[in-house]
Amino acid sequence: MEKEIKNILMEIEKKFGKESIMLLGSKQDLNVEIFSTGSLAIDHALGINGFPKGRIIEIYGPESSGKTTIALHAIAEIQKSGGVAAFIDAEHSIDPNYAKNLGVNIDNLILSQPDSGEQALEIVDILAKSSSIDLIVVDSVAALVPEVELNGEMKDQVMGAQARLMSKALRKITGSLNKSKTTVIFINQIREKIGTFFGNPETTPGGRALKFYSSIRLDVRKVSSVSTGEVISGNNIKIKVVKNKLSAPFKEAFTEIVFSKGISKISEAVEFAENLKIITRKGAWFYYNDQNIAQGKSNLKDLLEKNEALYSEILTKVISALSKENVNSIL
């Protein structure tokens, strides 16, 4: 029986190529590689300390909620590790200066501003098959307009064209990603379902295919504004992991996005350090190693911004504590 199975496997491999079929235990590269999102809070909520390589990720939410900011931070992290990233700007709205402020090396970022949805997704497929690109960001699904719609008149209604386009493209792209270990992040918007009286009236453009093929789906929402004096300097946002094939879903992350600077990593470190009792609070005063270091959270953030050695020391302790198995009982 064992010999028969071995012969069958050899026959299939001979016909369809090496590794077309195998025993699960013989597959050495099944362990998913991870890269940081650039946010300590999001890394922790994902349960795997970052985004997986070779998978599709959807980041969706209302306008100005921080979707593109999260994607740009992911690009910066890939580039820091020596990887190559591409940005498919279907909305034709990328801000090079903002990307640079977030740590993106714009000189090494591949940019495409396609004319149609077909062109955009074909470029994604070619880049993925090349095995030379580590991360591709598509901004956004809603802007992937099918050629049949572009070539038609304003009065024409083309039902389901974008959904069919996405379904066909994702079937091709998914197979390429597994071999190349390229990650694709699709940024998506939110639409209201017409005539919905019960249940969630919100939906995302592009049909059901993207929901199905995505290994991770993040719902990004603005919670409140952040003010410095009388000036609004940023937003507090909530990220909910609504789908996660690699860890437990439905976890939430909260972070602060500072205008022109992106995710405040110092704010994240302070919140985690306080929750983990690395930094303790007595009234308005903050203590570290039983020493009074700052009065008020804003002063603590200013201190860590100026004192890189102290910030690095606290951050190292936070990351170490988060890696422990009992961290969920602490937070």
UniProtKB/Swiss-Prot annotation:
- InterPro entries hit by this protein: AAA+_ATPase (IPR003593), DNA_recomb/repair_RecA (IPR013765), DNA_recomb/repair_RecA_CS (IPR020584), P-loop_NTPase (IPR027417), RecA-like_C (IPR049261), RecA-like_N (IPR049428), RecA_ATP-bd (IPR020588), RecA_C_sf (IPR023400)
Any one Gene Ontology BP term: SOS response
Cellular component terms per the entry's GO annotation: cytosol
Presence of keyword ATP-binding: yes
Which of this chain's residues are annotated to bind ATP? Answer: 61-68
SMART domains in alphabetical order: AAA
Q: Does the record carry Cytoplasm as a key word?
A: yes
Its subcellular locations are: Cytoplasm
Annotated SUPFAM superfamilies: P-loop containing nucleoside triphosphate hydrolases (SSF52540), RecA protein, C-terminal domain (SSF54752)
Q: What is its main location?
A: cytoplasm
List UniProt keywords, sorted A-Z.
ATP-binding, Cytoplasm, DNA damage, DNA recombination, DNA repair, DNA-binding, Nucleotide-binding, SOS response
According to the UniProt entry, its GO molecular function terms are: ATP binding; ATP hydrolysis activity; ATP-dependent DNA damage sensor activity; damaged DNA binding; single-stranded DNA binding
Q: Give a single Pfam family match.
A: RecA_C
**NCBIfam families from the entry?**
tigrfam_recA
Kindly give the HAMAP family that the UniProt entry links to this protein. RecA
Q: Which family does it belong to?
A: Belongs to the RecA family.
Q: What does this protein do?
A: Can catalyze the hydrolysis of ATP in the presence of single-stranded DNA, the ATP-dependent uptake of single-stranded DNA by duplex DNA, and the ATP-dependent hybridization of homologous single-stranded DNAs. It interacts with LexA causing its activation and leading to its autocatalytic cleavage.
Listed name of the protein? Protein RecA
Its gene name is recA
